[in-house]
Structure formats: C-alpha cells, structure tokens
Amino acid sequence: MYDRAPRFTQLTLSSTTSEIGPGTYNINRSLGGDRGSYAPFLSLSIRDSGFLGSASALHSPGPGQYNSDITRNHVLGGNSLQNRSKRFDDVLSDVPGPGAYNVTNDVSPARKIKAKSPKITSKAVRPSLSPAAPSIPSPGQAFGYEEDAQGVLHKHKVPSRDHSLGPAFYSPAPEELWSSQKYKGVQFGKMSGRREPLKGADEPGPGHYELQEDQTVQYENVNVKREQRSRSELSIPRYHELVPLQEEKKGVPGPGQYYIKSQFETSSNTHRPAQSPPFLSQAQRFSPVKDETPPVGAYNDPRCALEILKKGRALNKNPFGQTAVRFLPENRSKATPGPGAYNMFGYGLAQESLKKASLQSSRKAAFGSVAQRRIFLPSKEEMSTPGPTQYKVEKTNEALYKKQSTAAFKSASDRLVVSLFAKDTPPPGSYNVSQSFEKTQCLHQYSKPRNENARKRQSCFLSAASRNTDVLHNDPHTPGPAYYSPDVKSSSTLALIISKEDRFKDPKDEVPGPTAYELSPVIMDTVLKGTFNVTLHNPLMSSTRSLSSHRSWRKPTAHSSA
C-alpha cells in the first residue's frame, strides 16, 4: 500500500510490448550472424493468430456470400404482424359484361344439313329476299351496312376487341422496402450471439523477458504533496460519529433563548394590595371556542380499575428526582363530571342568587376598591340643601298626537313570549316513553268491553272485511230480496270469494296425547309391577283375588236363573 514502486495501470492487449517496433531491430547483426535454427523463437509448435478467434473462422463465408433475401423476409421483433394478407380482398364479379359476348356470323351446322336436304319446291316464283337494314338493330347489326355495286347490303363485321384485363383488374404486389420492414424497437434485447474474446497465446512473447533490472532513482517533490494535503475535502461523519454530535447539539440553547436582566427594569412591589376582580365577578369574560365536553373514554370508570395491574412495576427513572406530572392534559377525567353526575335542580335562579349573596358578603371592598368607606353623617349645612326629589320641574306642553295612545303601545300583552325556565319543565324520567311509543307508533289496542252485551257488539266493529265489497256489482237484471221464494234455498255463486275461511289450514296432529289413554282400575293407583317376592305386599294379588271372588259369586246366580 505504501510502496513507491511504479504501478502498471495499462496492460497490452497483444503478446508484444511497445518497445518492439520498426527501428528497434539491428538488421546488420541479424544478417551477419549465423542462424542456429530455422524455428522461430526456438519452437516448432503451431501458433494461432490473435486476430482470428479460432481455426473454424477461416472456413466461414465472406460478406458477399450471404443471401440477403432470407434476412429481409425474417424481421425480428415484429411478432404481432406476421400475417401479410389483405384484410379486405377485391370483389370480382363472375357475371360477364355487355361486350363480353362473341356473336358468330356463320350459320350453325344443323341449319346447313337442313338446307342440303332435298325439299319439294313450289313452282310459284318466290321473291328474292335481299337483306335490308332492320329498324331496331340487334347488338350484332349495330355496326352499319355497306351497299354493293349490285345493290346488296353487306353487314360490317364486329371490330376486334381487346380481351385483356384493364388496369383496374391488376393487383401487383408492391415491392416493400427493407427500411420499412425493419423492427423499430430495441434489437439488442433479442440478440443471442456472443462476441468471442481476443486471447493471445499463453507463451511469453519477445520482449517479456527482463534481462537487466531498471535501477533508476525516482524523485518525488515533497512540497507538492503538502499543497495537495492542504486542500479542503468534504468530510461526511459516519453513523457512530453522527449520534454523539446530535446529542451534544440538543443541550445547547438556540438563538433568542437567553434572558439577561436589565438594570433599568421596574421592581415589582410585593406589598401592594391585592386587586379584586372587576364588577365583583370572577367568571370568565370570553369563554374559549373549543368544546369542553370530555371525549369518549375520559370518564373514570370503576370497571377499568384492573388495567393498573397490566402495567409494568419496574421503577422508572424520574427526571430531577420529581414524580409530579410535568404536562397536564387539558381534559382531565377528575375535573369533568361523569354521566349521571349532573344536578339538574341545583342550577336555578335561587341557587345563583344565593351564590352571589354569599360571594358579596365575604368581600370587604366594593367596586374594586380596598379603601375603608366612611360612614355618611350629614352636617347642618348639608341637611339644609334640598335633595334630588325636592326640585319641581316644569312640565312642557306635549303635542296632542303624542298623548293619543296607539294600538301598538296600548296592548298589555307581551310581544315576545318568554321561554319557560328549565325548572318548570318535568325531568326526563317523569315521562313514560314505552307506553307513549306503543300508542303512537305500534298497533292500537282497544280497551276491553265492560259487560257481555258490549263484548258481543265489539266483534262487529273489529271485523277487517270491507262493508261495501266491490265484488257485488249492481245489476238491474238481478232480482231483489222480494223476488226470492222462502221455500227455495239459492246457493250463492260467490261463496268462494266472500268466504273468510283460510285456504291453507294448519295441519293438526292426530296422534293421541298423554291424557287420551285410559288405565285399568287395577293399575291406576300404583306403579308397582308383578313380583314373585312373598314378603312384599303386592296390591295386584289382592285385586285379582277380589275379581275372581266376584266372578265366582256371580256364576251360581246364572245357573239358578237358568
């Protein structure tokens, strides 16, 4: 680390150093001397050139031997647009156009055969049918006629028509440029080829041998090093150095925190009389806008007394040896009353006046003064002076319109109704909320009837059926009650609609209950079953004996009657 030997920062890429080159060789000595061996560098091994990566690179093709069409067709990166066919092909109709028909001039061979067959010609002279131009020419006769020297009309032939397709029917494939087929994105992300590193031979080359050591002395300027040391460098403290610096900075007070006493300050008089509150009131003039109601959980609930046991009992380090609370919260649970701790009847006019009277009696001074008030004893001169009510003030004549009373000032009723005091209203527990809610919001329950006649009549008014049903329509053809015969009973057709019986009745369980069974009189009053133990008194045996004796007593009567 502290060695002064030169460091080689740049290494040569080839197998030779920069000391070997043109001008460094001694040609005369090499030509004149005898060669001891024809092998270069005393070695007959094959040396690979450093410019060729491997021997296989010699057999690789040159730059003009590649087929560029393959690379043009294979566009890297354009995977989403592989289909080059047209989305909408040109619609070509298969129906021939108006000039696509070819009308032949020769007569069909069937007509020629008919013409050659011998026919019976009539002796009557037929007029010669000379072709004439038709009034409405067909498409084959629309090119005109030419009159011969003999006056025979010859039809013009149809001109030769070019049947090749026009320019609208061609669809040549446009030759796409190679620049338009290239992928415009990043290409190096998809390359998989690697560049072979250029490695030289492992054998040492000429010039790598140091036959003579370099013993030159290197000089260093000490003054230059001192100038470099004096330069200011950025010093960033580490974490273990930064922590004590921050802790030392906390104990130093900031600017403006010093309080220097001045010699011109007014000394505070501690013996002056205490100032009483103005207007004999100690109430706060301007109450804060902030709501003073305690938040949720601020009450001292005795149910939370076991939470103290959850806290740790380890002794905390008290600052300055004090255990008092330094910062008291604004809303303390002790100062705020809990739910149900308010006294509604204690805050009234009588309580406030009693509080003011006791407060004024305890104070000695009035109007904020502590000086002793002397007793007022008037002298003779002061007694002779008239008082405030002994003067006679002359009454001025008022206008007549001021003496007349109007309706606004003549009425003795209050214009603004004063709200009732809180003490006149009943407390919140005096109302029966449950009964009032059931009568107003729930179903109305009628009072019970007082006698039996009222109980019979009550069923008429408690019916939920409509009195005037919409089912019975007024029909003039329907007979009235006087048209019916009392002997014939007519069955009403609307019985299914007017009937109030339930369509779907509740299923009744037809299984007999526990009281439906009848026990025999023998086992009715006992739970004991038959036993073979003679020592126990078995009531069954006595009952069976009585029954057998009763039967034997009735049998001879039957024989005697017979």
UniProtKB/Swiss-Prot annotation:
Residues 193-202 have a biased composition (Basic and acidic residues). Residues 127-136 have a biased composition (Low complexity). The keyword Repeat applies. Residues 114-136, 192-215, 543-562 are annotated as: Disordered. STPGR repeats lie at residues 21-31, 60-73, 96-118, 204-227, 253-271, 336-350, 385-409, 425-462, 478-492. Coiled coil: none annotated. Pfam families: SHIPPO-rpt. Keywords: Repeat. Residues 551-562 have a biased composition (Basic residues). This is Sperm-tail PG-rich repeat-containing protein 2. It comes from Danio rerio (Zebrafish).
